[in-house]
């Protein structure tokens, strides 16, 4: 693809998201979503092959359905309230449709089926964009209407997402699908605390984006897309593989690392609001995610797979492109836990 066209498409995707985030008018929000969707399709199909075309088609159909439901909810709310501004939703049917449409855009369960399939069919760079930037617009709208959302509906979808995100990743060997199921589980954690505290949701989103960005940059750096290819990276780039192991454990929420902080703060916030059973179930279900992260860390760093090369280390490393942002992302995705007291005072 022509670099100028590709840059224009990326800028349009970002402009659409920005329009959604800064707007208080429902029509502008819908236009922002459509801008974002139409520019995202060619980005997903940058590597033009049947798998990418199929993934882009699935993404388009899902997002178009969600946009249709969103517009229907907006019109129903307009009939009852007579205004286009984002205020309290006056009609429960409109509110339910709105929540379902945004859940479909986010990839929350039970509308999650498109996320692993689309992520698997596209490149790692497009997958990074899909699992990070594309979450901003729907979550920003959910944060703005959080006071009107039915908490039982939101918590049910959140719990299902955490469960599906853990179960779905257990038997996977494709790293992109594992990252997709990880994304579904993280979205579940974010939306679980949404009815109680939107600041906590935003904080969790920022840490999730940092960890996912670091992980995808490591995968792009090592060109690994399966667990088998990941197991051979130790011979080629031991430092990158070690960093990958720590980042994976952070994504699983292991205590000394950054990924533990949002889980800790979300459970604390929910128990403050006299919700005990839900956070207990969430914490237990998070062990599923931790299991497959630890399995990946074990296979990548702690085992030496059979190789035709008898040397433990290659004397000449492959030439790889420098990623100047990578050290910063690694530090942020592993060492932010000591900042918990300062961040918890933001509520």
Swiss-Prot record:
One of its GO terms (biological process) is mitochondrial electron transport, NADH to ubiquinone. Pfam families: NADH_dehy_S2_C, Proton_antipo_M. It catalyses: a ubiquinone + NADH + 5 H(+)(in) = a ubiquinol + NAD(+) + 4 H(+)(out). It is an enzyme of class 7 (translocase). InterPro entries: Complex_I_Subunit_2 (IPR050175), NADH_DH_su2_C (IPR010933), NADH_UbQ_OxRdtase_chain2 (IPR003917), ND/Mrp_TM (IPR001750). The chain crosses the membrane at residues 3-23, 25-45, 59-79, 89-109, 149-169, 178-198, 200-220, 237-257, 274-294, 325-345. Keywords: Electron transport, Membrane, Mitochondrion, Mitochondrion inner membrane, NAD, Respiratory chain, Translocase, Transmembrane, Transmembrane helix, Transport, Ubiquinone. Its EC number is 7.1.1.2. One of its GO terms (cellular component) is respiratory chain complex I. It is a multi-pass membrane protein. GO terms for molecular function: NADH dehydrogenase (ubiquinone) activity. It is found in: Mitochondrion inner membrane. Core subunit of respiratory chain NADH dehydrogenase (Complex I) which is composed of 45 different subunits. Interacts with TMEM242. Core subunit of the mitochondrial membrane respiratory chain NADH dehydrogenase (Complex I) which catalyzes electron transfer from NADH through the respiratory chain, using ubiquinone as an electron acceptor. Essential for the catalytic activity and assembly of complex I. Belongs to the complex I subunit 2 family. This is NADH-ubiquinone oxidoreductase chain 2. It comes from Sus scrofa (Pig). The gene is MT-ND2.
């Amino acid at each position: 693809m022509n670099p100028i066209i590709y840059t224009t498409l990326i800028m349009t995707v970002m402009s659409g998201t920005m329009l959604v985030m800064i707007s208080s008018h429902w029509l502008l929000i819908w236009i922002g979503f459509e801008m974002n969707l139409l520019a995202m399709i060619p980005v997903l199909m940058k590597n033009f092959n049947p798998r990418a075309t199929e993934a882009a088609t699935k993404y388009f159909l899902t997002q178009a359905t969600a946009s249709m439901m969103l517009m229907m909810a907006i019109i129903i709310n307009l009939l009852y309230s007579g205004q286009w501004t984002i205020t309290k939703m006056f009609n429960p049917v409109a509110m339910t449709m709105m929540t379902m449409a945004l859940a479909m855009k986010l990839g929350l369960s039970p509308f999650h089926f498109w996320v692993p399939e689309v992520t698997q069919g596209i490149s790692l760079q497009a997958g990074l964009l899909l699992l990070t930037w594309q979450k901003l617009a729907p979550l920003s709208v959910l944060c703005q209407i959080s006071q009107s959302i039915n908490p039982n509906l939101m918590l049910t979808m959140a719990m299902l997402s955490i469960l599906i995100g853990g179960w779905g990743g257990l038997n996977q060997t494709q790293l992109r699908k594992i990252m997709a199921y990880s994304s579904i589980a993280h979205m579940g954690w974010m939306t679980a605390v949404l009815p109680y505290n939107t600041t906590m949701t935003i904080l969790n989103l920022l840490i999730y984006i940092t960890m996912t960005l670091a992980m995808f940059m490591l995968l792009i750096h090592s060109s690994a897309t399966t667990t088998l290819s990941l197991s051979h990276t130790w011979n080629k780039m031991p430092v990158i593989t070690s960093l990958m192991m720590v980042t994976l454990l952070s994504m699983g929420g292991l205590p000394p690392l950054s990924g533990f902080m949002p889980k800790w703060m979300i459970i604390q916030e929910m128990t403050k609001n006299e919700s005990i059973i839900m956070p207990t179930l969430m914490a237990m279900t998070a062990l599923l995610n931790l299991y497959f992260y630890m399995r990946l860390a074990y296979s990548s760093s702690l085992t030496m797979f059979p190789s035709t090369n008898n040397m433990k280390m290659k004397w000449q490393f492959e030439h790889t492109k420098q990623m100047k942002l990578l050290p910063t992302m690694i530090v942020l995705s592993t060492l932010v836990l000591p900042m918990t007291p300062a961040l918890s005072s933001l509520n």
